Amino acid sequence: MKYLLDLILLLPLLIVFSIESLVKLFIPKKKKSVAGEIVLITGAGHGIGRLTAYEFAKLNTKLVLWDINKNGIEETAAKCRKLGAQAHPFVVDCSQREEIYSAAKKVKEEVGDVSILVNNAGVVYTADLFATQDPQIEKTFEVNVLAHFWTTKAFLPVMMKNNHGHIVTVASAAGHTVVPFLLAYCSSKFAAVGFHRALTDELAALGRTGVRTSCLCPNFINTGFIKNPSTNLGPTLEPEEVVEHLMHGILTEKQMIFVPSSIALLTVLERIVPERFLQVLKHRINVKFDAVVGYKDK
């Protein structure tokens, strides 16, 4: 009975906070300044990471750029410098924990304390479970989620000391709703979303509310990693559109960034509608892409 009473007493807060959220939809939140911040972006040698670096370069930040591809990261750094920013490229394999820690030490010594960390590096293998090799599964988790632990452990302490900073997790809509033939990828992105949510709550529990968190969850992006993607949710997203949403989310300190926003509705439906209806809905959404299928029906 006591718990029921406590729940009833919380209802006014639910109403107030719901109205507050509704009002915020129509009143744009002021964007914060990131001038002078040291921004580290993993996977900055191409795609979302590269375009995100360009946007931060326009905002008077100092950039630390990580990627496994030396040519790609140097091209990104050169463009960032043309945009007026200091850019420090590092060749780093984000699947290797000790390499991450070693590079983090160099960053602190040569550049300074990172105050905005964008965990963007990622890999994807489009295949069913049987066609996905064991090393590919390991690599998927090493890059897509374990690297987030290592980079955050390296750079978060100073942010917590200053009660100032921002940790950005680049995840995926596949971190909320599953897609066949992306088993390893979906699993790793669910873990990345969980990392973001758990870290957010942990920072709050420790009283470090000045360290903000954001998580990007887009639909299919036209970056070439997944071949011939299509879905009835809409056209394949262009990287520029996704980065525009990402930057807006970071600068307004939005915790969960869905692109398109309809993804948020789908994640809610998955939790409340009957499973049979959900299967019909997924059939109508009709997600397609080129994939390798190793299972043979004998």
Swiss-Prot record:
This is Estradiol 17-beta-dehydrogenase 11. Pfam families: adh_short (PF00106). Its EC number is 1.1.1.62. One of its GO terms (cellular component) is lipid droplet. The lineage of its organism: Eukaryota, Metazoa, Chordata, Craniata, Vertebrata. It comes from the Eukaryota. InterPro entries: NAD(P)-bd_dom_sf, SDR_fam. Expressed in the liver (at protein level). Also expressed in the intestine and, at much lower levels, in the kidney.
